[in-house]
C-alpha cells in the first residue's frame, strides 16, 4: 500500500542457468512445475540456445517459458533469434548489449518474440527512450540499478501509462551490521 500496490499476491517464477545436460535441466524444470511455479526463466548462451529450447519445448509443450540472454548476442545472430521464434516463448530478456537500445528496436522489428529489457534499464529516461522506439514490450526493474524506489516507481508508471508490463527483478541489497 505504501508504494501504491494494488494486489496482495505476486507470482514468482523459477530461474535456471546453464546445466550439465539437457536431462538435468528437464528434471529441474519438472520439479519447478510440480512445486507450482507458473513460469520458468532459462538462461541461454551460445551452444545452449536452440537445441536446449527444442528439448525443453518437446518435453513441456504448454508451459510458460522465457529466456535471458544477459547481453550475450548481437544482431549478427538474427537467424538464431528467428529459429527460436517457433518455441512460443513469452519473451526474450536482454538479448543484446545493455547500452544499445537501437539494436534492440531493430531486433524487435525483425522477430515475433517480444523483447524484455533488463540490464538496459538504468533509469526513467532510458526507459522512455526505449519505449519511444519500440525497443521492448516488457521491462524488468531492479531498484538497485535504477537509483532506488523512487525511480523504480517512476519507471513502473511510465510503463503502465503505455501498457508495457513490468516486474521487479533481483539485485536486492542487504547488509549485516556489527
List each model region and its residues.
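Catalytic domains of carbohydrate-active enzymes, especially glycoside hydrolases
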Residues: 31-43
Amino acid at each position: 500500500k505504501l508504494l501504491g500496490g494494488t494486489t496482495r499476491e505476486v507470482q514468482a517464477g523459477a530461474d535456471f542457468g546453464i546445466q550439465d545436460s539437457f536431462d538435468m535441466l528437464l528434471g529441474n524444470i519438472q520439479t519447478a512445475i510440480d512445486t507450482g511455479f507458473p513460469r520458468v526463466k532459462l538462461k541461454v548462451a551460445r551452444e545452449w540456445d536452440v537445441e536446449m529450447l527444442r528439448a525443453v519445448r518437446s518435453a513441456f509443450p504448454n508451459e510458460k517459458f522465457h529466456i535471458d540472454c544477459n547481453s550475450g548476442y548481437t544482431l549478427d545472430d538474427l537467424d538464431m533469434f528467428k529459429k527460436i521464434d517457433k518455441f512460443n516463448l513469452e519473451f526474450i530478456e536482454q538479448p543484446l548489449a545493455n547500452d544499445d537500445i537501437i539494436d534492440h528496436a531493430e531486433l524487435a522489428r525483425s522477430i515475433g518474440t517480444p523483447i524484455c529489457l533488463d540490464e538496459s534499464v538504468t533509469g526513467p529516461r532510458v526507459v522512455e527512450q526505449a519505449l519511444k522506439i519500440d525497443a521492448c514490450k516488457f521491462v524488468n526493474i531492479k531498484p538497485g540499478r535504477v537509483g532506488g524506489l523512487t525511480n523504480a516507481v517512476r519507471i513502473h508508471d511510465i510503463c503502465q501509462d503505455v501498457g508495457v508490463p513490468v516486474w521487479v527483478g533481483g539485485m536486492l541489497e542487504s547488509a549485516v551490521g556489527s
